[in-house]
Swiss-Prot record:
Positions of the propeptide segment: 19-24
Cellular location(s): Secreted
Residue positions of the active site: 64, 109, 203
Oligomer and partners: Monomer.
Entry-linked InterPro entries: Peptidase_S1_PA, Peptidase_S1_PA_chymotrypsin, Peptidase_S1A, Trypsin_dom, TRYPSIN_HIS
Highest classification ranks of the organism: Eukaryota, Metazoa, Chordata, Craniata, Vertebrata
UniProtKB keywords: Disulfide bond, Glycoprotein, Hemostasis impairing toxin, Hydrolase, Protease, Secreted, Serine protease, Signal, Toxin, Zymogen
Stated role: Snake venom serine protease that may act in the hemostasis system of the prey.
Species, as recorded: Vipera nikolskii
Signal peptide range in chain numbering: 1-18
Family: Belongs to the peptidase S1 family. Snake venom subfamily.
EC number: 3.4.21.-
Tissue expression remark: Expressed by the venom gland.
UniProt GO cellular component terms: extracellular region; secretory granule
Name by which UniProt lists this protein: Snake venom serine protease nikobin
Length: 257
């Protein structure tokens, strides 16, 4: 069964939390503390997600991560240990499709957040550049986040975990997910044989290819990391003009075209 992974976040009060574990994002390892200066921990009254710092004032995450009392934490690794350069912000503006009827699991699941004050770059805080070209099938890319390290049982870690996955041909994903349109603005990525995957709590997390932000986790199979069930990531390259126009102040279009 396919579903939006954010649904599991609604049960956070019932979940078991874990300290550092040897079992990791599904099939991954604890991220090196210095490899994710752009990674943001995004929370609200409804769920926990991840996001990506793209310049000192703007963060990208998934539209379905929206909620009240949103908080964006940067410079975070172990959530139980405060880094000296950790910085916390709240949204000043949010640009996304306001109604869930305007975005789907394969289109417009993206939110651009303007922070209330810019962050200062530091050892553990620095932006990543947007994808400069479409995803290349077969490319090995990096996923990361504080999502569950086990599925279907949900165990949320204190530290982010990372894994390498591959860009998979879109038509292969259509074969598994027939509801996908002929051309969706998503990147299909994972391990076709299963074993490595992002999962519940990773929504909005970055897909990093060649050092650039190629995608944001949108949805996938449940349980996670199953064979023939790669994840679907919002394709950043397809939204780069909208993102750049908002940042430059050339448009106020809340919902991307």
């Amino acid at each position: 069964m396919v579903l939006i992974r954010v649904l599991a976040n609604l049960l956070l009060l019932q979940l078991s939390y874990a300290q550092k574990s040897s079992e990791l994002v599904i099939g991954g390892d604890e991220c090196n503390i210095n490899e994710h200066p752009f990674l943001a921990f995004v929370t609200s009254d409804r769920r926990r997600c991840a996001g990506t710092l793209i310049n000192q004032e703007w963060v990208l995450t998934a539209a379905h991560c929206n909620g009240k009392y949103m908080k964006i934490e940067l410079g975070v690794h172990d959530k139980m240990v405060r880094n000296e350069d950790k910085q916390t912000r709240v949204p000043k503006q949010k640009f996304f499709c306001l109604s869930s009827k305007e975005y789907t699991m394969w289109d417009k699941d993206i939110m651009l957040i303007r922070l209330n004050t810019p962050v200062n770059n530091s050892t553990h805080i620095a932006p990543v550049s947007l994808a400069s070209r479409p995803p290349v099938v077969g490319s090995v890319c990096r996923i990361m986040g504080w999502g569950t390290i086990s599925s279907p049982k949900v165990i949320l870690p204190d530290v982010p975990h990372c894994a390498n996955i591959e860009i998979i041909k879109y038509s292969k994903c259509q074969g598994v997910h027939p509801e996908l349109p002929a051309k969706g603005r998503v990147v299909c990525a994972g391990i076709w044989q299963g074993g490595k995957d992002s999962c519940h709590g990773d929504s909005g997390a970055p897909l990093i290819c060649n050092g650039q932000l190629q995608g944001l986790l949108s949805w996938g199979g449940d349980p996670c990391a199953q064979p023939l069930q790669p994840g679907l990531y919002t394709d950043i390259f397809d939204y780069s003009d909208w993102i750049q126009s908002i940042i430059a102040g050339n448009t106020t279009a809340t919902c991307p075209p």
